Amino acid sequence: KRFLDLFLTTLGLIVLSPLFLIIYIYIYILDGKNVIIKQNRVGLHGKQFKMYKFRTMKNDSHKQRDDLKELNEHDEVIFKIENDPRIIPGTHFLRNYSLDELPQFFNVLKGEMSIVGPRPLFDEDTKLFNQKYMRRLNVLPGITGLLQINERNTSEFSTWYKYDIEYIENWSLYLDFKII
């Protein structure tokens, strides 16, 4: 799996480098510096790491999270808002097509993530886990996974968990290729 991750990531970075540059310039023009952000996420065995993303929300948007909790349309573990006021106008398409996730290829190179696996969550979200949810931390988190190809916008963490466990229990290189 690691060899596949390294091979596909290297290939992806080479092929997609012009797109990286275009997105970088686009976000810089729209909202200025700090185009690539680092977010604290929880990975394999609960270890924290810095996950890279193209910034599609205004600077310091994470500080507004507590003020917006009443708008959260998801269950207690997932925090997402439809028409989130923190999103930079003009970057919705980056989010809709997961282009904001492209810098995570660097996390894969560092061995913190895999191309396929459960989505890495914020530390504060994993503190809301009950014991059964901790099982999803037994594998490297991924850029994409069963959830993203089946029910990307689901509002229930139990659905996330269902797909994560299905992936963990049925993992094979064939399944990874099917997901990719």
Residue ranges of each PLM-predicted region?
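Cytochrome P450 core scaffold surrounding the K-helix E-X-X-R motif
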Residues: 60-69, 118, 122-124
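A short, structured surface patch at a secondary-structure boundary
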Residues: 77-139, 180
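Short glycine/proline- and charge-enriched loop/turn segments
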Residues: 69-74, 129-130, 162
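A hydrophobic, helix-centered structural microdomain
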Residues: 1-62, 173, 178-180
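Active-site/binding-pocket entry motifs
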Residues: 57-64, 152-156
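Short, solvent-exposed cationic patches
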Residues: 65-83, 170
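C-terminal terminal-structure detector
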Residues: 82, 132-180
